């Protein structure tokens, strides 16, 4: 399977989740073996950051990368789109210190990348494959990874809210199945949003880019895009956070109520024990499967909402 990049540069702008100000982003093609890199405009010039577990400096509201005085926040939805479409090499130019939040999902980034076009390169795709079972747990939340020739996620969430409850999703992540999760938006609770705004945080958060819930209902006038949009978004976040390994990660991941902090802790553990749990693999062209033979998305939702 060959590495890929985009065919041409493409730009967008939008609101930054943290600052509430307009930020600008340009996606550029990149040479083979570049990987995903962020070129961040700062007062001292352009600083480059390549995603890896150790450069994650914050996991509160979103995943933030930082290095040498430069940082870029809210990277996970863009990274999920890049990984979901199996793009290996791309340069992300950022003005404003954040990836724009857009509508709170990855749908706009998928549209941008598809509009830019995807170009096959010459070199073989490099991946890290889970070599043996590994379990990571903290405070009752966990990630279990098993060897698997692909990227499969089984995710469970549980929230004491009548519209969420317990939800599960099982999906093989491919360019064909990624649409199952790409449109799922980030979500939060009204009491949390009000508190964050009072502290000058999440100033760009609104009903335009997040699902907001009170104690019983969704406040967004158009409601949910699917009853299990919540777990779909958690899978989206997980795909984006797993992109921090620098090259695609293959395995079967069974995830219980994780979040950005646990995802990053899991990756740091893998990186520190790479000789035990990871196998570096090149996927030659001969291993590429026709799209029609790729695994389809498999969705299973438990605990249908008590309130429709």
Swiss-Prot record:
Its EC number is 3.5.1.108. The gene is lpxC. Its cofactor is Zn(2+). Keywords: Hydrolase, Lipid A biosynthesis, Lipid biosynthesis, Lipid metabolism, Metal-binding, Zinc. Pathway: Glycolipid biosynthesis; lipid IV(A) biosynthesis; lipid IV(A) from (3R)-3-hydroxytetradecanoyl-[acyl-carrier-protein] and UDP-N-acetyl-alpha-D-glucosamine: step 2/6. The keyword Protease does not apply. It is an enzyme of class 3 (hydrolase). One of its GO terms (molecular function) is metal ion binding. Catalyzes the hydrolysis of UDP-3-O-myristoyl-N-acetylglucosamine to form UDP-3-O-myristoylglucosamine and acetate, the committed step in lipid A biosynthesis. It holds the Pfam family LpxC. This is UDP-3-O-acyl-N-acetylglucosamine deacetylase. One of its GO terms (biological process) is lipid A biosynthetic process.
């Amino acid at each position: 399977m060959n590495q890929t990049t985009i065919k041409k540069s493409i730009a967008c702008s939008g609101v930054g989740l943290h600052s509430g100000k307009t930020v600008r982003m340009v996606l550029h093609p990149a040479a083979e073996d570049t990987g995903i890199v962020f070129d961040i405009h700062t007062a001292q010039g352009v600083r480059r950051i390549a995603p890896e577990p150790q450069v994650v400096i914050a996991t509160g509201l979103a995943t933030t990368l930082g290095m040498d005085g430069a940082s870029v926040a809210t990277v996970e939805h863009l990274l999920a789109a890049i990984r979901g479409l199996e793009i290996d090499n791309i340069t992300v130019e950022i003005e404003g210190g954040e990836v724009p939040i857009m509508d709170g999902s990855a749908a706009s980034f998928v549209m941008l990348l598809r509009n830019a076009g995807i170009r096959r390169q010459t070199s073989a795709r490099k991946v890290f494959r889970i070599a043996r079972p590994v379990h990571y747990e903290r405070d009752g939340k966990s990630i279990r990874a098993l060897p698997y020739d692909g990227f499969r996620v089984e995710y469970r969430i549980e929230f004491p809210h009548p519209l969420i409850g317990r939800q599960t999703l099982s999906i093989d992540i491919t360019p064909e199945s990624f649409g199952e999760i790409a449109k799922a938006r980030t979500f939060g609770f009204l009491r949390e949003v009000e508190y964050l705004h009072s502290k000058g945080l999440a100033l760009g958060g609104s009903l335009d880019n997040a699902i907001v819930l009170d104690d019983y209902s969704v406040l967004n006038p158009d409601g949910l895009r699917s009853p299990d949009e919540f777990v779909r978004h958690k899978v989206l976040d997980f795909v984006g956070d797993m992109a921090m390994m620098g090259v695609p990660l293959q395995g079967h991941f069974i995830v219980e109520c994780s979040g950005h902090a646990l995802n990053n802790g899991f990756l740091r553990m893998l990186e520190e024990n790479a000789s035990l749990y990871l196998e570096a693999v090149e996927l030659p062209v001969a291993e590429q499967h026709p799209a029609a033979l790729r695994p389809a998305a498999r969705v299973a939702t438990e605990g249908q909402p008590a309130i429709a």
